[in-house]
Structures are given as C-alpha cells and as structure tokens.
C-alpha cells in the first residue's frame, strides 16, 4: 500500500519519490489498483513539491526586499595595500 507523503520532508526527497512513482507508472506493468494508488501519491507529492517551491520563492522575495531597503555604507576597514 502506498504511504502518504510526510509534510516535513524536503523538496529533494519529495522530487525523488515523485520521479520514482513516474518511472513505475511509465513501465505500465502495475495492476490498475496499484497504479491508481501510485498516481494518487504522485499527485500529493507534486502538490507538496509545488508548496515547497512557493515557500522558497516567498523567502527569496523577502530577502531581496530586505536587501533593497538596506542602506549601503562605505567599508571603513583596511584596504589591500595595508593602508587604513
């Protein structure tokens, strides 16, 4: 019986499981009921992967906004020639 995807797994694990399911389904040698269960799990994994990508995109947008809003100051440290 196919397991439901854990919501805490990372994107790479989700993608690997989804690729494995796709390979099984493309083989065409699964009985109908098992193929349907695999397909259902694949849909859940695809949804989870999409959510992970959207979360990552939102985090990137937040980081970029913080960077754009931050003032740029001249560096006051030593230069490469040893001068202060």
UniProtKB/Swiss-Prot annotation:
Compartments (UniProt record): Cytoplasm
Source domain of life: Bacteria
Cytoplasm in keyword set: yes
Gene encoding the protein: xseB
GO CC terms in record: cytosol; exodeoxyribonuclease VII complex
Protein name: Exodeoxyribonuclease 7 small subunit
Keywords, sorted A to Z: Cytoplasm, Exonuclease, Hydrolase, Nuclease
UniProt source species: Haemophilus influenzae (strain PittEE)
Reaction it catalyzes: Exonucleolytic cleavage in either 5'- to 3'- or 3'- to 5'-direction to yield nucleoside 5'-phosphates
Assembly information from the UniProt record: Heterooligomer composed of large and small subunits.
GO MF terms held by the record: exodeoxyribonuclease VII activity
Family membership noted in the UniProt record: Belongs to the XseB family.
Matching SUPFAM superfamilies: XseB-like
PANTHER family linked to this entry: EXODEOXYRIBONUCLEASE 7 SMALL SUBUNIT (PTHR34137:SF1)
Function of the molecule: Bidirectionally degrades single-stranded DNA into large acid-insoluble oligonucleotides, which are then degraded further into small acid-soluble oligonucleotides.
Its EC number(s): 3.1.11.6
GO annotation, biological process: DNA catabolic process
């Amino acid at each position: 019986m196919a397991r439901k995807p854990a919501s805490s797994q990372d994107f790479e694990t989700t993608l690997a499981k989804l690729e494995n399911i796709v390979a099984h389904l493309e083989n065409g040698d699964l009985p109908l009921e098992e193929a349907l269960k695999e397909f259902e799990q694949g849909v859940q994994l695809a949804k989870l992967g999409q959510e992970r990508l959207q979360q990552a995109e939102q985090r990137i947008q937040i980081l970029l906004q913080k960077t754009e809003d931050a003032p740029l100051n001249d560096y006051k440290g030593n230069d490469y020639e040893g001068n202060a």
